[in-house]
């Protein structure tokens, strides 16, 4: 048996042992929907007209949940808030709840960019203010009167226990619960960037330790994106889709590949996919208002991060709910030669990375996407991608005219949708991007 096989066997053995020793978490008390006093903290940044939950026929309800957690020898109390974004009428509900713990920046940073697909598919979105900073730094200062009673003890284990208790509340389908008319079939936990660390902590601290009464998992699948650190994702008994970006892969520190990479698996006790998307950085201007206007030294990428994450979520949901096995993708390629082009990643003749999950933006290119944006202490720039648009000469060398370019984009787009690497609901966005590229006819160049 190889070292890799032995390690995998040990991980699975430990997981099976942990699963045999579980407890059913207590249900938290629930208040709500909360109607005041004053405005509700929205949990989302201002959105363009036509893209809000209300525009998709969604209702957002706020609830306060409270209970106790274990912290060392103590059992301190907590009280926090959850937001439930649900389709109206309930007949539109898919049976899927996609949850995430509020990022330390105060927003639901996975749902925010991927919301179009989540809402078109009728999923409920559950936002949990599970970290002490969510309450003390973000929510209470926004409206001290409305949120005066909220309090969360510090600590990652506290957050994990709150997630488990809220998950029990949602999965229990209580007649008086927040989703009384919405029969929940599956619950997923999502996490991006700092919140992906919350997801990892939950897997380690509560996934096997806190279970439903029948011993099944509270969380039915995990989506970790823009993940930090070098640790591999934990082996669990539900599907996991892991989507580190070029930012994490490029800074991974390995001679070949990244230390957090592990083999894809269809084993029922270890369902796992690694999706490294070519062209996608930790952050970009399309989905993050922070970059408008651009505070960075270099142009910030306008890559469709949300569309690619929605693709990963779709595969996760279908794998967990319907048993549809998702496709496998090659990892991003390395040449480990940062001195040559500023990147440890292997780049093609256009300056875009080789390998990974493909898309029209790198396969029918009009720009070069890279990482990092700029060194130094400006975090928002260090995690951003770069985008250098082709000049007129380069565009002319690639495409006969605009029609030729748009035709190539459409052809590749249809292939990607068929292969499962792009969702149909984003096709018009891709086409719109293509139509906006200024490629002049030959006689006018």
Indicate residue ranges for each PLM-predicted region:
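Positively charged n-region of N-terminal signal peptides that target proteins for export
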Residues: 1-6
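N-terminal signal peptide c-region/cleavage motif recognized by signal peptidases
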Residues: 13-15
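C-terminal His-loop and adjacent cap/lid subdomain of alpha/beta-hydrolase
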Residues: 20-445
């Amino acid at each position: 048996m190889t070292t890799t096989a032995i390690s995998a066997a040990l991980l699975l053995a430990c997981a099976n042992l942990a699963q045999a020793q579980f407890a059913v978490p207590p249900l938290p008390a629930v208040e709500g929907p909360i109607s005041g006093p004053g405005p509700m903290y929205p949990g989302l940044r201002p959105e363009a007209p036509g893209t809000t939950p209300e525009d998709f026929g969604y209702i957002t309800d706020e609830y306060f949940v409270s209970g106790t957690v274990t912290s060392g020898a103590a059992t301190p109390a907590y009280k926090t808030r959850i937001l439930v974004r649900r389709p109206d009428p309930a007949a539109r509900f898919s049976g899927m709840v996609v949850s995430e713990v509020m990022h330390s920046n105060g927003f639901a940073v996975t749902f925010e960019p991927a919301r179009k697909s989540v809402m078109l598919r009728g999923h409920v979105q559950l936002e949990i203010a599970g970290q002490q900073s969510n309450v003390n730094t973000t929510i209470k200062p926004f409206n001290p009167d409305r949120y005066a009673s909220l309090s969360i003890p510090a600590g990652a284990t506290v957050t994990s226990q709150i997630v488990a208790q809220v998950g029990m509340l949602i999965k229990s389908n209580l007649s008086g619960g927040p989703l009384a008319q919405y029969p929940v079939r599956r619950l997923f936990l999502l996490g991006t960037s700092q919140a992906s660390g919350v997801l990892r902590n939950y897997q380690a601290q509560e996934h096997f330790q806190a279970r439903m009464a029948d011993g099944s998992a509270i969380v039915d699948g995990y989506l970790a994106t823009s993940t930090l650190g070098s640790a591999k994702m934990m082996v669990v008994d539900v599907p996991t889709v892991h989507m580190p970006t070029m930012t994490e892969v490029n800074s991974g520190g390995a001679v070949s590949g990244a230390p957090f990479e592990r083999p894809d698996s269809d084993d029922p006790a270890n369902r796992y996919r690694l999706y490294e998307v070519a062209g996608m950085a930790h952050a970009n201007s399309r989905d993050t208002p922070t970059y408008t206007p651009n505070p960075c030294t270099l142009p910030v990428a306008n890559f469709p991060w949300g569309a690619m994450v929605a693709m990963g979520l779709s595969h996760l949901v279908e794998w967990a709910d319907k048993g549809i096995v998702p496709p496998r993708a090659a990892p991003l390629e390395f040449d480990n030669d940062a001195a040559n082009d500023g990147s440890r990643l292997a780049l093609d003749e256009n300056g875009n990375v080789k390998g990974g999950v493909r898309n029209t933006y790198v396969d029918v290119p009009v720009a070069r996407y890279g990482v990092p944006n700029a060194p130094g202490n400006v975090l928002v720039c260090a995690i951003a991608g770069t985008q250098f648009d082709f000049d007129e000469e380069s565009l002319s060398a690639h495409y006969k005219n605009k029609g030729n370019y748009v035709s190539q984009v459409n052809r590749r787009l249809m292939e990607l949708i068929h292969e499962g690497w792009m969702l149909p609901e984003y096709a018009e966005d891709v086409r719109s991007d293509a139509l906006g590229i200024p490629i002049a006819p030959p006689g006018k160049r």
